[in-house]
Amino acid sequence: MQGVVGVYSGDNAIQKALNNLYGVQHRGQESAGMTAAGGNSMRTWKGKGLVSNVCRDLFRSFMHPDDYVVIGCASGENADKIALPPLEYESDRFKFSLALDGHVQNRGSRLNEEVVGSLIMEKLRGGTGIEVAIRETMRELPNAYFSMVAALLDKDERRSELVAVRDAHGVRPLYLAMNEDELFVASESAPIDVMESMGQGIEQRQDIAPGSLVRRSDEGLTERKLVEPQHAHCAFEWVYFGRPDSVMEGRNVHSVRKRLGQALVETHSLRAAYGGPRKDVVVIPIPDSGRSVCVGVAEALGVTADEGVIKNAYLGRTYIIDDPEFRRIASDLKHNTIRDTVRGKKVIITDDSIVRGTVSESVAKNLIKVGAEEVDYLVSYAPIYYPCFSDPPDKHLAAAPYEGCSLAEIGELVAHSLPSIKEVRYNSPENVIDAIGLPRERLCTYCITGENPLVKTRAPEITMHDSSPED
């Protein structure tokens, strides 16, 4: 996963891009980078680490008054320093730098940007315009999905432009905001909100439609539909990936997670067992994505919600670690408990998912150690049976062996494999879809249903006129 941003502005574009890049840091912590373009130059700087380590100080030495276009990314992919995004490509006439959030299947050890960027540049070198080059690349990669930002420099015309593209399925989010003179693009709406609260003028804001391209240069703004949309928005964006203050496809992430918590209470008739007011029951979240779910559960039950597990924000995601022992140690280091919150109480934990079960068991075991009477685990997502397209196919999933069982049976079987947890309760796929509030056919729920929207059909093309390389 990756957070991407793009800015077209004649007023300190680099600083504005950097501010927005901080706002998508949660989408990737392995590396960061930025590309600035203007006049007849393009410069990229990148490195391993967080945005604050890589970009905060270095960018000042790259600033140039002609820089109208800046893109940036915070990447979660572990790659060699040389191959970190954004990646630059060059022909006799064009320079092109891109960063994308998504996945290209069968790419081997190459970055997503290497596959997409090389195809686009190959077409630019052949005299194809940028819009047709991107459309043809999307056609050649029918099962890929990506939200892309790019800086394009035409050396002959001494003109730079910002390009933003979202694939036909819209699996990953991409948001834009603009005024008469500026265009801002980001993976999520939250950094745009922050920018506006700091005094940035915004006249229009919206999701970039699936299958669409947006361009901004000194010649103005262009919006184009490249292929017909075939909506398949990743349901896990609302459950885990997205910031709670972001709005995706018109649905606020925090509100969706609250509804998921309320659905758990209704589905499993939890009021009879835990309904308040009771002083011996407390609902605590696994930070951060469990917090909004915790609010929904506590409100529905009428019991206290509190903080009982504290996360070390400087340790990365533990579920991506393959070695079980290293994963357990990392989880123990990442989470600590607040004794006063849980001692002598029945603890209800809210979490977005149980992937392997390592974190769940580690946290529950520590809660019991410090005095919790029992630990029940409420999972806002449905049981995960299939690894995402971007995950290794042999990834261990706690619920995978129990596909076909009822929700109650799956909860019992998973709880049996986690000795410190008394009960595990999941939402159903239907609950997840209802909480998001989009039609089922507009969501990708492959990991919980096995329905793969990316291989049903190829997106129909839009007829386009390609009269010059500038098109």
Predicted segment positions?
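Conserved short alpha-helical segments that host acidic/polar catalytic motifs at enzyme active sites
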Residues: M1-I208, R215-V281, I286
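Flexible loop/turn segments at secondary-structure boundaries
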Residues: I14, N78, N106, V171-R172, ...
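Generic beta-strand/beta-sheet core signal
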Residues: A99, A151, V165, A177, ...
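A conserved beta-strand->alpha-helix junction
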Residues: E114-L119, T304-G316, S417-I436
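Secondary-structure transition/capping motifs at alpha-helix termini
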Residues: G126, L270-K279, A300-D306, D340-R343, ...
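PRPP-dependent phosphoribosyltransferase catalytic core
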Residues: R159, P173, R205, V227, ...
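Phosphate/diphosphate-binding loops
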Residues: Q200-E203, G211, Q262, E266-H268, ...
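Short, glycine/charge-rich flexible loops or terminal/linker lids adjacent to PRPP-binding catalytic cores
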Residues: E299-V347, G357-E361, Y385-K395
